UniProtKB/Swiss-Prot annotation:
SMART domains hit by this protein: RING
Protein's pathway: Protein modification; protein ubiquitination
Keywords carried by this UniProt record: Membrane, Metal-binding, Transferase, Transmembrane, Transmembrane helix, Ubl conjugation pathway, Zinc, Zinc-finger
PANTHER family documented for this protein: RING-H2 FINGER PROTEIN ATL16
Protein name as it appears in the record: RING-H2 finger protein ATL57
Topology of the protein relative to the lipid bilayer: Single-pass membrane protein
Organism per entry: Arabidopsis thaliana
GO biological process terms held by the UniProt record: protein ubiquitination
This protein's domain notes: The RING-type zinc finger domain mediates binding to an E2 ubiquitin-conjugating enzyme.
EC number of this enzyme: 2.3.2.27
Entry superkingdom: Eukaryota
Name of the gene this protein is made from: ATL57
A Pfam family: zf-RING_2
Length: 237
């Protein structure tokens, strides 16, 4: 009976693979340590693509604001000057760029000034320019262009200065002086009789002055009469 049990134990031992295989299995199990799982990586603060996109948008907004302010300031400054394209094309085409840049610019505060009467402007003499006449000025000081032979010009009788017809008409519509010498007397003495009679405002002002003068004279005569009467009464007493 004992031998049978021993045989069964040997068979079981051999079936398990022997002692060496058993020890190797035990050593492998005990020697292999458990590998810890790596910790999760923290999320990135800002993606590089997103940062580049935000930077480009900020630069674009900056340039848009800068150019909008610049063009608005340029438009405001250019609106305060008079457009010289309204001048006659025949004269503006002859003007050089240097003279064009130094043309007369009319500012806003002087737009309300009242110039010469239109009838007086039309009464200025007009003739054709000739170099043989030896005029006082050989170019128009308003548009800064030279006179051409046979060109129609307008002269101011008192000082003798000549200008282009359109230029001097535009000037005299805002001013009452010569553009060159700034003299406020435009007509000579012999042409004064040809001027139109004074307007209604000046006539009323003249009548008012006459009435005031008459009242002053009457008051002075009354005061002198009263003084004379009082003097006679004192002498009689």
């Amino acid at each position: 009976m004992e031998t049978k049990h021993l045989r069964k134990l040997l068979q079981l031992y051999q079936a398990c693979g022997g002692e060496q295989e058993l020890t190797k299995t035990v050593q492998n199990v005990t020697s292999s340590p458990l590998t810890p799982t790596p910790p999760p990586q923290p999320p990135s603060a800002l993606d590089s693509t997103m940062a580049l996109t935000i930077f480009i948008l900020l630069v674009a907004l900056f340039f848009m604001g800068f150019f909008s302010v610049y063009f608005r300031h340029f438009a405001d400054s250019s609106s305060s000057t008079v457009d010289i394209s309204s001048m006659p094309r025949t004269r503006s085409s002859r003007m050089s760029p240097r003279r064009l840049s130094t043309s007369v610019v009319v500012s806003r505060p002087y737009s309300f000034r009242r110039g010469l009467d239109s009838q007086a402007v039309r009464s200025l003499p007009v003739y054709r320019y000739t170099k043989a006449a030896k005029q006082r000025n050989e170019d128009c000081v308003i548009c800064l262009s030279d006179f051409e032979e046979g060109e129609t010009v307008k002269v101011i009788p008192h000082c003798g200065h000549v200008f282009h017809v359109d230029c001097v008409d535009t000037w005299l519509s805002s001013y009452v002086t010569c553009p060159l010498c700034r003299s406020n007397q435009l007509f000579s003495d012999k042409d004064l009789g040809m001027q139109e009679p004074p307007d209604q405002d000046s006539a009323e002002e003249h009548d008012t002055c006459d009435g005031v003068d008459t009242c002053v004279r009457r008051c002075s005569s009354c005061s002198s009469l009263g003084q004379r009467t009082g003097l006679e009464r004192s002498l009689s007493l």
